[in-house]
Amino acid sequence: MITKRNIPPCKKNWKYKKKSISLTLITICYMFLFLTSCKPGKKNSINLLLLLLNTLDNKNVNEKIEDSTNTDPSSNVNEEDENSINANANDNAPSDSDSSNPRSPDKNPVNPTSPNSSSADIGIKILSHSIFMAPTNLSSWGDLGQEERAQRIASSSYIKNQDIIVFEGLSHNNAEKILLEKIRSEYPYQTNVVGRTKKGWNATLGAYTTSPMANGGVIIVSKWPIEEKVQYIFNNSNCGQDQYYNKGFAYVKINKDGKKFHVIGTQLQAREPDCFNSGETIRKLQLNDIKSFIDSKDIPKDETVLITGDLNIIKGSNEYFDMISKLNVNEPRYVGVPFTLDTKTNALAAYYYEKEKPIYLDYILVSKLHAQPPVWQNLAYDPISNTTWKRSDGYTSYEFSDRYPVYGFIYADSSTPTKSGHKRKYDQVSFQSTFNRKFIQADHNKKDGWLKADTRIKTDFTKFNLLQENVSESNPSCMNSGSVRIESSYYLNYYWNWFIGAASGDYGYYTKFNNGSDSLGIKNLDNGCLKDGSRVAFYDWDTIGGGYYYLTVWDKGSWKEHLFLWVQSFLSSREIFYLHLDSNPPKDWSKDLIYHH
């Protein structure tokens, strides 16, 4: 039954009469103000009118305060009945079937003028990077160069000029200390790593335990004050290697210039063969945990909520679209390199996931139920370290991680990467024999197949990456004669080496996984820096007879066009090659970026 509250009608009518009188007076005053503005000596008249208008306006404000539902707790009820309250709420919300609202809520574009765009008016720049720093006590990983890579990440340029950084996969204690301490001056506000301790958190939720061998590896650092820190431990990470980790997510509330940003950083269940089909199910449960947590926080609609991290969900898959729906987030505008785990360009990824195809797994997403920026871009970037690092077994690399980082931002600016960072001067070079004018190439069918100078056409198999491991600079502008590691550009981590059983006991050359010839060298016959068109020869050490010999293109029989270690002194056309640098420019996505105009 609809009932009315017992309010004297005279009071209600008087209130509307007062409002009517005020509006009439204001209208008359403004008309008089307009007329007097055209007359001399108008200043005093105008000031008097403005004072009157201000008084009327303040009076109206006071009347509103007096009528506020917060003035008297006993009267903190709407004048309409409960049913009309619900009806009003529904009337104010756009309906899917309402012809005045042509867009459905799920397709509503990001709108800078929407009431939910308050905190988005102040831009936020956030970086997410899964840095593959597993603890050494897990035997399946061991030495990954964690501490050396931490040093290089801390001093790198790709982590500069951000508001927030979310690191995932940072479970190595010493590497964590090195990295966080070195970046503290730029990012002074830091969380603890998820899952190690309850100290330093405002709250610890979920299935926290002290028994796992490793923490959850997620850390958030910020240029701006962190007002709240919560860690949540998943209770369903029980598949494969993840069962040994306290995996979960970190939540922080950040205050940037008075505006609040809410960030969740996480690393979901890994994609492991040991998990069979259960990995996707576990990730769904973990996404449910994240969404339930966000809902429980009752975050104001005009504040931005970001969900970021190594989500281990392949972009474009059914699982990906389920994630977008479950989290109720907008798809970002994707720019940059096409994959974040790229086994074709990232040697560290290729080393540990040799059989995997390149995939995109890392995201920075914006909740649709909260403040919306005018646009939201995710840029996957492929930087390399300026200096190389070495593992204890001698493996040398310039990769920061097996994953590429992702930037999240509204508009690009002068600090936004616009080109691939993975293009080195002496990558994807080719060698053309001066004897038969053919290019050296790796085997098309076998990663560890023979090297042969047998094609006149440049292909992916004729390209090789050069690295001088005794030179710390990863991308030198000048490479001179000397010791060199030659890697197939197509088969990453497969290096030139010899097999002494080829052709009745001779040194035949092929590409071998993670094992290049220690004594292989390159000689620039034109002297100076290696450049496009340089004439070069390759030499190596004879481990049986002793002494250095040059590699030659065999010219007869069943081993014709194979490479052998053969000539010691005199160089003929069979031992001389033209070096061709790769003339292709690095991938450029500057035209795909959106800048503020």
Curated annotation (Swiss-Prot):
Region (Disordered): 64-119
Polar residues composition bias: residue spans: 68-77
Highest taxon of source: Bacteria
Disulfide bonds: none
Reactions catalysed according to its record: a sphingomyelin + H2O = phosphocholine + an N-acylsphing-4-enine + H(+)
MF GO annotations: phospholipase activity; sphingomyelin phosphodiesterase activity
Signal peptide: 1-37
Enzyme nomenclature, EC number: 3.1.4.12
Keywords, comma-separated and alphabetical: Hydrolase, Secreted, Signal
Principal subcellular localisation of the protein: secreted
Enzyme category, top tier: hydrolase
GO terms for cellular component: extracellular region
InterPro entries assigned to the protein according to its UniProt record, in alphabetical order: Endo/exonu/phosph_ase_sf (IPR036691), Endo/exonuclease/phosphatase (IPR005135), Sph/SMPD2-like (IPR038772), Sphingomyelinase/PLipase_C (IPR017766)
Gene3D superfamilies the UniProt entry points to: Endonuclease/exonuclease/phosphatase
Bilayer-crossing regions: none
Compositional bias of kind Low complexity: 84-119
Protein name as annotated: Sphingomyelinase C 1
Naturally occurring in which organism (per UniProt): Leptospira interrogans serogroup Icterohaemorrhagiae serovar Lai (strain 56601)
Gene (UniProt): sph1
